[in-house]
């Protein structure tokens, strides 16, 4: 079953909250999102202030990693509370409590 954009955004935020700063390919594999969709999603999350790009220079290479912001963590908390309050799926929450 295909994920909605909201579910994809939440999955990306969860990955960054759980693993810290990650390169694009690491986010791609851990969130199970293809590269072009991930780039669009990260652009949106960056515009919303939920994710930030961090740049590092290593000799000749410039490395970019992505990290969740404090605002992104707050959004994850609100989403978890909403999921619990509404019991939308009748399943256990998809967002592990250890992130909060």
Language model region names:
Residues 58-78:
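Basic, amphipathic "hinge/linker" alpha-helix immediately C-terminal to the N-terminal HTH DNA-binding motif
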Residues 52-58:
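Short Lys/Arg-enriched helix C-cap and helix-to-coil transition segments
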Residues 21-30:
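Short acidic, hydrophobic short linear motifs in intrinsically disordered regions
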Residues 74-100:
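Amphipathic alpha-helical dimerization/coiled-coil segments
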Residues 11, 15-19:
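Short amphipathic alpha-helical elements of helix-turn-helix/winged-helix folds
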Residues 1-11:
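Short alpha-helical segments that sit at the start of domains
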Residues 2, 33-47, 53:
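Short amphipathic alpha-helical interaction segments
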